[in-house]
C-alpha cells in the first residue's frame, strides 16, 4: 500500500537527516497470545474506544484484497463483530475517538480502485456502524491523519488524493466536518504518525510521505501548529505507529517504513525532545501496524502490519 503513495513522493536522502544517537531509556515489549486474532494484515485502522473500554480494529490489506471486518480486543482475546452494516473494504483509513460525541470516527482510505472520502461512526455500546452524509467533507484521500485534538473533537489533517498530498485541516462537529484554518500548518503529507499527549494537551506529528521534506516534528495545541527544533529525532518513517503512553508521560512512536526498509525502533517524544527507548525484546520491524493505549487492557498495544512482504497478526504490549 505504501508504494501507491511513494509514487509521487521525493523520498531520497531523507534518511540521512535523522540522528543516530540520543538519550536512551529501557522498556520491554511483551508478546500477547490471544485465543483468537484477526487474520494477517497491514494498513488497518485501530484505536481505543473509551465508550466500550475496548480496542476497535477495522479493515486493512491482506496481500490480495482490502478488508472490511471489524474486531474488538478486551485484553484477552480478539472478537469479530458481525455488523449488519459496515464501511466498504479499504486500507490506509484512519479512526479516532471523539470524546464529545463518544463515537469512533472513521475517514478515508483506498479500496484498490479509488481514494475514499466517506465518514462512518462506530458506537461501542451498540456495536454498530452508521454512515454519515455531511454537507462538507475533507478531500477523498488515503493515509489521512485522524486524532482526538486537545478539545476532545476528532481532527483530520492531510492525506494523499492520488495526485497531491494535502495540508488542509478539518474537525468533526458531531454531524459534519468544519474546515479549520490555523495560522500555520505542517507541510502537506500523508501516512504521518500522530499521538496526543493528554497531559500537555498537544498532538505530536512526525514523518510521513510528502513532496516536501517530512522529516520534522510538529505539535498542535488545539489552535496552532508549531514546528519543533529538535537536534535529535527518529529515522524518517512513513506509516509508523504513535500513541500517548501515560506511564512514560510521552508520545511513543514505533516502527514504520523507511526507504523500503521497515523499522522496529521505539522512540518517545517527551514534550521537548525525542528519546530512543531500548528493549531486550522487540516486535518484528513493520509498517502500517495498529496502535492504541488502553490502561484497562494493559497499556500500549500494537497489532499487525507488514515487514516487507510478510503480513503480520501478532499482538504486543509495551511494559515501561
Go through the PLM ranges and name each one.
Residues 9-18:
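Bacterial N-terminal signal peptides
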